[in-house]
Amino acid sequence: MFLNGTFHELKGSAFDKPMKQEFINFFARKNNFSLFYIKVDNSRLKDTFCSNTSRVFNYLLKISMDYFIRNNYIPSENHILQLDERNERTESRFFLEDYLNTELCITGINQGNFEVSYFDSANNSNIQIADVFSNILYSHLKTGNYADELDTLRDNGILKYIFEFPL
């Protein structure tokens, strides 16, 4: 979180439990956004499926967005996705945006368009916040110690859904 003694960026892995609890309590009071997780059980995936991480990432994003829209968790409208540039391969910079627009918009599942942008997480507070929330679920799956915190997010209407893959 700090570089040469100055604040650099939020990193969920640098938060201890009290910091994560304070983070959750802060956002639970705000209740001005919705949180959706995509949880993947890697042990149930075939090696051939996982051989291209960009393809897996794009596919999981597509099927989860499809699910969220079809089940009215998110509206069928324009969507702006801000992603960590670590999820981008130079040769496929616009592939995800084209893929989502083809699979979800042209087919009529989504009535708007998808716009995908990639950022250095150090320069994007939304990605940093998402990183902390992601680490909270990851920590819970590893330790089982964050059930109360996840319940707080649910009870305050922030945590809307955890999409699990494979189904």
Summary of predicted features, one role per range:
Residues 1-167:
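Phosphate-ester processing/binding pockets and catalytic centers
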